[in-house]
Amino acid sequence: MNGGPAGQDAHRPVLLDEALDALAIRPHGVYVDGTFGRGGHAAGILARLGPEGRLWLVDRDPEAIAVARARHGDDPRCTIAHGRFDELPGRLEAAGLLHRVDGLLLDLGVSSPQLDSAERGFSFMREGPLDMRMDTSRGVTAREWLEQVDEKTLSRALRDYGEERHSRRIARALIRAREDGALPETTGALARLIAENVPGRPEPGKHPATRSFQALRIAINGELEALDALLERICDLLAPGGRLVVISFHSLEDRRVKRYIRKQSTVGDLPPSVPVAPEALQPRLRSVGRALRPGEAEQAANPRARSAVMRVAERLP
């Protein structure tokens, strides 16, 4: 999640200095910013790279890619690519960069510019159309998805992607509204309908629609599937000593990253009868330090930083 509130350095990423340090940037290295956003991390990486260094700037948001091209299109060190980060392995392989990436950074979730743009439809704090696509050049909008999804799938998405306890009740209300020709068309209308179907007192400091909006966004963008697909190829991309740095903003993402690093950091335990090459049993990553969260000062300056957690792993030889 790139950026902070207006009035400060509007697009300063959360844990910026910590992420740059964790990458252990070498002047001649090859690095990948898998979530360019508005370029805060990229600028920091480029400042530490020498003329022979290389940086891939990747984002699925056309607006972010436009910013990348405007700022770094003339920099010979930069390769700019529009697409999901799970498409990265194929692109890097085509460029001959398997096992040659010295650092890969992922700043997951929705960016502050996306949240702050009413037209994008990510936030109920600003009245706008129900879009929610991270890539506005393809895919269905949230409104289109709600027009065709069945109640069971919708309920499961709200439960699994939003950890919403009242997923069935909310799903039933949305399907009923659709059948009555009253399916919400704006973020505000959707938030109100959801709030009406969340019983009890709301959680302190959290709108009743927060979990559902997260779930819908994750579902229509395939965020967790993209993350899982990329993680499975990380060890094919990183050079020995290369770093993986991931900043997550909710437990669904962080659990996946934590589980992946743990799995790749342990020795395989298979029966002697299973014919596996010895190197296949060896750990491929080592966890670097503990999970890191923003300090009190950063959280006070940027409330969106409160849920952030950064994990780092290093590719073993």
From Swiss-Prot:
GO terms classed as biological process: rRNA base methylation
UniProt xrefs under Gene3D superfamilies: Putative methyltransferase TM0872, insert domain, Vaccinia Virus protein VP39
Coiled-coil region list: none
Top EC group: transferase
Keywords, in A-Z order: Cytoplasm, Methyltransferase, rRNA processing, S-adenosyl-L-methionine, Transferase
Domain of life: Bacteria
EC number, UniProt record: 2.1.1.199
Record's subcellular location: Cytoplasm
GO molecular function terms attached to this record: rRNA (cytosine-N4-)-methyltransferase activity
A GO-annotated cellular component: cytoplasm
Reaction catalysis annotation: cytidine(1402) in 16S rRNA + S-adenosyl-L-methionine = N(4)-methylcytidine(1402) in 16S rRNA + S-adenosyl-L-homocysteine + H(+)
Binding-site residues for S-adenosyl-L-methionine, renumbered to this chain: 39-41, 59, 85, 107, 114
UniProt-listed Pfam families: Methyltransf_5 (PF01795)
Function: Specifically methylates the N4 position of cytidine in position 1402 (C1402) of 16S rRNA.
Record family assignment: Belongs to the methyltransferase superfamily. RsmH family.
Protein name: Ribosomal RNA small subunit methyltransferase H
Lineage start: Bacteria, Pseudomonadati, Pseudomonadota, Gammaproteobacteria, Chromatiales
